[in-house]
A protein has these predicted regions:
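Conserved beta-sheet core of the metallophosphoesterase superfamily
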Residues: 122-125, 141, 215-285
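A short C-terminal boundary segment appended to hydrolase-like catalytic domains
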Residues: 215, 284-330
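Beta-strand-turn-beta hairpins that frame and shape the catalytic cleft
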Residues: 1-4, 148-158, 197-201, 251-257, ...
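Active-site environment of divalent metal-dependent phosphoester hydrolases
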Residues: 10-15, 35-39, 126-136, 164-169, ...
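Active-site-proximal segments of metal-dependent phosphoesterases and phosphodiesterases across multiple
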Residues: 86-104, 108, 112, 198-234
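Binuclear metal-dependent hydrolase catalytic cores centered on His/Asp/Glu-rich metal-binding motifs
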Residues: 152-199, 219-225
């Protein structure tokens, strides 16, 4: 069985269409972030972001950080004697939020139409922190969040979202991240789900703690619960994303971790542009991973960057094919 795994497409739907037309695989897994902005033009997105930041600051000052911003705004507008400024901005924010939901659903419909063209392959999708809950979209049948699917006898399950506030995305519609609680508390939604399902392959937008989770100038950002589960259960593959710069292949406690970096073009934390196009091809023989190839899509051509053989040990696992493109990522 051949699996193609991509993450963080950030609205690059044309690139996804090219990938599907230029590759052959039994299964495609497309992990969040699927969307870039919840509007059709940047000026509207900027206006929405500014209003959201305004109410976020007000929410902090009023010690109501536990409330979703949209609920906070609704409550404010029902409060007697609010200022004209708050009423005007709040009403506009409500209108933008309704529009954002409509645009998001339209964009997911476009993506679903593209994925539906590949009828002979299984294609799954996972929401990231830029996405709304996919169960309310055209992608609901492909959704991996808190769901599992059978892939030729292997069980794949996913957990989406991330433990971060994402400005510019309506909080009301995103997947609430329930993977932060201590495992021993019994209230970690992600851990409890995986413990009940016992998946062979895990897809998680947020990486595991200490593996592909380092953010420039901030340090590690991964999920301790995900790492704990994989370390103590027979997980073949843990496929993650979210942290674009800490990509790679790593094996820990017999689990193979993969982060392909971003597939869609993104702006980096340092202000540069990461053009993306990266993905993994994973070859499976029964329950064994026989080979992994790290690749890059450039326009309509696919370039092999590195091969990985999990059966070998140490540095022998990796063979660099395209030294120039490989070094450009380091």
């Amino acid at each position: 069985m051949r699996i193609i795994y991509v993450a963080d497409i950030h609205g690059a739907f044309d690139r996804v269409k090219t990938l599907l037309s230029e590759t052959v695989a039994d299964v495609y897994i497309i992990a969040g972030d699927l969307i870039d902005i919840p509007f059709y033009n940047m000026s509207t997105a900027i206006n929405y972001h500014e209003l959201q930041s305004y109410f976020h600051g007000l929410r902090v000052r009023m010690q109501k950080e536990s409330m979703v911003i949209e609920d906070f705004v609704d409550e404010l507008l029902n409060t007697p004697n609010i200022s004209e400024e708050i009423e005007e901005k709040g009403t506009k924010y409500q209108q933008y939020t309704i529009r954002a939901r409509r645009v998001l659903q339209q964009k997911y419909k476009v993506l679903e139409n593209i994925l539906a063209m590949k009828q002979k392959s299984q294609i799954f999708a996972l929401p990231g922190n830029y996405d709304m809950d996919l169960k309310y979209t055209s992608l609901h049948e492909r959704d991996l969040h808190l769901r599992w699917h059978d892939m030729r006898g292997l069980k794949v399950a996913g957990y989406g979202g991330a433990n971060i506030w994402t400005p510019g995305i309506p909080e009301r519609y995103v997947v609430p991240y329930g993977g932060s609680a201590d495992v021993e508390s019994g209230h970690n939604e992600m851990y409890n789900f995986f413990k009940a399902i016992k998946p062979d392959i895990i897809v998680s937008h947020q990486p595991a703690h200490g593996i592909h989770d380092r953010i420039y100038q901030f340090g590690t950002s991964g999920s301790s619960a995900l790492r704990y589960y994989c370390d103590n259960n027979p997980v073949l593959l843990c496929l993650t994303g979210h942290v674009h710069m800490d990509w790679g292949f790593q094996i820990s406690e017999e689990t193979i971790y993969l982060n392909p970096s971003n597939f869609g073009e993104v702006t980096t934390l340092t202000g540069g542009v990461a053009e993306g196009g990266f993905f993994y091809t994973i070859e499976m023989e029964g329950r064994h991973v026989s080979k992994i190839i790290f690749k890059k899509l450039v326009e309509d051509r696919i370039h092999d960057i590195a091969d990985y053989n999990p059966q070998k040990s140490g540095h022998r696992q990796e063979t660099i094919v395209d030294n120039e493109r490989y070094k450009a990522l380091k």
